């Protein structure tokens, strides 16, 4: 079955060459966002597709996943609810066609589903830290509207020497003057900053396994912290299309752990 999945993945890439190219880094679905029929999340060679037959399928090289909902709805869409669950909805019904398992420890909040480098979709949340919210009229967009981005930092990863996350005209930059800055439309238009310019040399920013963001200098002295600590686990920092940087976690569900629905 794994071989057939790889072949299916290659066929999908050939059939949808243009969408895959234009949506190559559409790797995030947030609570309240909508993945419409025949749209997908994608990262490198992996694609998480809300198919026209109402089946949600992850095409990858690591065993894949499917919701097993073929033919159970029409015009199906995928959303992420405020308990960290994916929901498939049919246009002809008010009842969800399929809902992903709920972690017993989850609480209401904002979650994020991320198709990551491991070629699996993992749900993180709830949000435990964020930069200030921007203008509300920029808040939502369907996944098909999101451009190519470099928008995600995972637990244990670091940024330094002007490295950045980016989406649309927003950037979150770990500047070489030791300041972490969120900018819009250019490096001089600062939306938010850590206020740590000049407080260290060769500084770097790291996302820890409790969701803590910390800026340290080259002597490992702490320069700034987000002061939001969750339980031990895997977290993700996402620079969202509305220009807000948000930490979600810990991970509450993944296609990698859902063997019962694997292809």
Swiss-Prot record:
Keywords: Disulfide bond, Hemagglutinin, Lectin, Mannose-binding, Repeat, Signal
InterPro entries documented for this protein: Bulb-type_lectin_dom, Bulb-type_lectin_dom_sf
Gene designation: LECCVA2
A GO molecular function held by the record: D-mannose binding
Subunit relationships: Heterotetramer of 2 domain 1 and 2 domain 2 chains arranged as a dimer of domain 1/domain 2 heterodimers.
Gene Ontology biological process terms in this record: response to other organism
Keyword Flavoprotein belongs to the record: no
Phylogenetic classification of the source organism: Eukaryota, Viridiplantae, Streptophyta, Embryophyta, Tracheophyta
Cystine residue pairs: 54-76, 178-203
Organism of derivation: Crocus vernus (Dutch crocus)
Annotated protein name in UniProt: Mannose-specific lectin 2
């Amino acid at each position: 079955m794994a071989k057939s999945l790889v072949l299916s993945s290659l066929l999908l890439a050939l059939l949808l060459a243009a969408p895959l190219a234009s949506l190559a880094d559409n790797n995030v679905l947030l609570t309240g966002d909508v993945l419409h029929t025949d749209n997908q999340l994608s990262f490198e060679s992996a694609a998480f597709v809300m198919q026209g037959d109402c089946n949600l399928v992850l095409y990858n090289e690591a065993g894949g996943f499917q919701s097993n909902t073929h033919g159970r709805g029409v015009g199906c869409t995928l959303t992420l609810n405020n308990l960290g669950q994916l929901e498939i909805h049919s246009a002809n019904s008010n009842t969800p066609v399929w809902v992903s398992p709920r972690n017993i420890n989850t609480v209401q909040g904002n979650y994020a589903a991320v198709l990551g480098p491991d070629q699996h979709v993992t749900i993180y949340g709830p949000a435990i830290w964020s930069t200030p919210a921007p203008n509300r009229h920029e808040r939502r967009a369907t996944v098909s509207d999101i451009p190519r981005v470099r928008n995600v930092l995972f637990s244990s990863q670091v940024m330094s020497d002007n490295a950045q996350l980016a989406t649309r005209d927003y950037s979150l930059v770990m500047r070489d003057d030791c300041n972490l800055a969120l900018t819009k439309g250019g490096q001089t238009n600062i939306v938010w900053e850590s206020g740590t310019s000049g407080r260290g040399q060769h500084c770097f920013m790291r996302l820890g396994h409790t969701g803590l963001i910390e800026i340290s200098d080259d002597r490992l002295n702490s320069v700034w912290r987000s002061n939001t600590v969750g339980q031990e686990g895997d977290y993700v920092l996402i620079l969202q299309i509305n220009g807000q940087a948000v930490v979600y976690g810990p991970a509450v569900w993944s296609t990698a752990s859902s063997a019962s629905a694997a292809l």
